[in-house]
Amino acid sequence: DGYDAELCYLRDRTGKEVDFLVTLKGRPWMAVEVKVSETAVDPSLIYFRDRLKIPYVYQVVLEARRDMIDRGVRVVPAHAFLGALP
């Protein structure tokens, strides 16, 4: 069969944005913000997570050396995130 999923870009009127939003059956399921080297959690991820009740929130960082959770957001090296995809 497959999944009733969509991949979107998320931005509000004030300019807050998240690079990727995956929805399942029309509901927000996972948000992903991508950074080159910044491991401090992007405030937009927390804003949208709380506002839209997104269950899985990641900040994927190209140059990160370790995986950590900060305020409920998983900050993960890009190689680990991409390596976990099916």
Feature-to-residue mapping (PLM):
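A cross-kingdom feature that marks ATP-driven nucleic-acid transaction machinery
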Residues: 1-86
